[in-house]
């Protein structure tokens, strides 16, 4: 089970790992907290506005999950408000879903090292949800840190997953989020040109790194 707050978090953050698990026949479910409806990116060139963005991002999310062949569950929280939600309530909500699915692994953001307040809040709630489960039934948690200083603060990640074997599928999932990815891809092209862009993207996105969460009190 992958738990992130926004459409595209799954594609940029863990789609290579997801694709590898799916190739092994492991079912994957994405619990997406919000529709990212308060995002600033409206496509490049612009094709969305504040009114149309929620529906556009929802369609992009469905498309990305289809490319990754994962089950999608949209949790219905409001974008940019996760930090103000009652963490225990969100954790209980997630716990109920996890107890239904019974996954062996949860991937989420590392609280405090995930840049965006929604990332930190959803990661904290996901880890709390697993903590609330019976120790005998707890899945492993892989927490993803993305802040600039995380290696200095946390040390080397426990898992560094080379996803170059499924890189094309990862890029398909990223590009499905056109309203968010088009500006980033355009910047790559502008800075490096097409071939160099592919190499730069592969270098930047070809590894997915995680810390194994330690639940020992």
Model-found features: residue ranges?
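Active-site rim/loop-helix segments in enzyme catalytic domains that contact anionic ligands
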Residues: 1-101, 128-137
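Metal-dependent de-N-acetylase/amidase catalytic core
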Residues: 1-3, 24, 71-73, 80-217
